[in-house]
UniProtKB/Swiss-Prot annotation:
Enzyme class (EC, first level): transferase
Organism listed in the record: Neisseria meningitidis serogroup B (strain ATCC BAA-335 / MC58)
Complexes and interactors: Monomer.
Pfam families attached to this UniProt entry: IMS, IMS_C, IMS_HHH_1
Primary gene name: dinB
Enzyme Commission number(s) from the entry: 2.7.7.7
Gene Ontology biological process terms in this record: DNA-templated DNA replication; error-prone translesion synthesis; SOS response
Keyword Nucleotidyltransferase (UniProt): yes
Binding site for Mg(2+): 10, 104
Record flagged with keyword Magnesium: yes
PROSITE patterns: UMUC
InterPro entries cross-referenced by the UniProt entry: DNA/RNA_pol_sf, DNA_pol_Y-fam_lit_finger_sf, DNA_pol_Y-fam_little_finger, DNA_polymerase-Y, DNApol_IV, IMS_HHH_1, Rev_trsase/Diguanyl_cyclase, UmuC
Xref: PANTHER family: DNA POLYMERASE KAPPA, DNA REPAIR POLYMERASE UMUC / TRANSFERASE FAMILY MEMBER
Full protein name: DNA polymerase IV
Length: 318
């Protein structure tokens, strides 16, 4: 088992929490961050809204049926990026091995941290305390020997908590881990696993590598390693971007048409970055990762600069 010390920091209901900080009179009410419209989907939901079954990627129409009293606020991506920059400034006090996953989550390798703190759990506590002191927002953290385990652990004490998974407890932890907690296991894959008698990562571990390959394709190789607590991926430090991008990870498998409901949000976020950096774009690429980790990309390149109004349309044409 790796001797690395990896922290996965995940802000709690980030977009919704930022909006509640800006509009404290809404605290205690179910708040949804989304554009209103028949085809819109939720960007984020406060914990009060989640009690009614609301979650990101849910259609606004469905959300209004489940929780008619919810308060809807439009997203403010410029503000979210500003707050995210504050959070990353906190990270840099402890390590330069920071791998952002989105505005509200990142991996940190604190095996050798700037403050020489021996216990990664203590590093996570300090980081979470500093984030709260400087932004008024709470974060959850998972601490483990690798990225796979740290990401799972960060969800274990949400919200505003942390979970430490030391190397000697990994196998026992995985033995009872529900399959749905494994990244990449969506509804379709989970149903297939259950048909094979699998319920936990421990059940999955009893299958040979070749068997998993037969059942799940190339993803079977990845599963074989993950359920044994193996993930050698390094934390990739931030590098200067050669392109401007934005992305979203959906919490569950969705039909293509419903997933496409996120394109207006992504297009607006992308255009804000383009205008802020004072650059021009002539090509647009759409990347889609499927439940079994296949990546599909489509790129369109034009002879003229893309105007604001055309960006979302170009994304749909991809």
């Amino acid at each position: 088992m790796s001797s690395r010390k990896i922290i996965h920091i995940d802000m709690d209901a980030f977009y919704a929490s930022v909006e509640l900080r800006e509009q404290p009179h809404l605290k205690g009410r179910p708040v949804v961050v989304a554009w209103e419209g028949a085809r819109s989907v939720i960007c984020a939901a406060s914990y009060e809204a989640r009690q009614f079954g609301l979650h990101s990627a849910m259609s606004v129409a469905t959300a209004k049926r489940l929780c008619p009293q919810a308060v809807y606020v439009p997203p403010h991506f410029d503000l979210y990026r500003q707050v995210s920059a504050q959070i990353h400034a906190v990270f840099r006090r402890y390590t330069d091995l920071i791998e952002p996953l989105s505005l509200d989550e990142a991996y940190l390798d604190v095996t050798r941290n700037f403050k020489n703190i021996p216990y990664a759990g203590d590093v996570a506590k300090e980081i979470r305390a500093a984030i709260f002191a400087e932004t008024g927002l709470t974060a959850s953290a998972g601490i483990a020997p690798n990225k796979f385990l740290a990401k799972i652990a960060s969800d274990w004490r949400k919200p505003n908590g942390q979970f430490v998974l030391p190397p000697h407890k990994v196998m026992a932890f995985l033995e009872t881990l529900p399959l749905g907690k494994i990244p990449g296991v969506g509804k379709v894959t989970l149903k297939k696993m259950q048909s094979l008698g699998m319920r936990t990562a421990g059940d999955l571990r009893r299958f040979e590598r070749g068997e998993l390959l037969n059942h799940f394709g190339r993803y079977g190789y990845r599963l074989y390693d993950l359920v044994r607590g193996t993930d050698e991926r390094p934390v990739k430090a931030e590098r200067e971007r050669l392109q401007i991008s934005t992305e979203i990870t959906l919490p569950e498998d969705l039909p293509l048409e419903q997933a496409a409901g996120h394109l207006p949000h992504l297009a607006e976020d992308l255009w804000r970055q383009i205008t802020r950096k004072n650059v021009e774009a002539q090509s647009v690429t759409l990347k889609l990762k499927t439940y079994d980790f296949r990546i599909i990309t489509r790129t369109l390149t034009y002879s003229s600069v893309l105007p604001d109004c055309a960006l979302c349309c170009r994304l749909r044409k991809c």
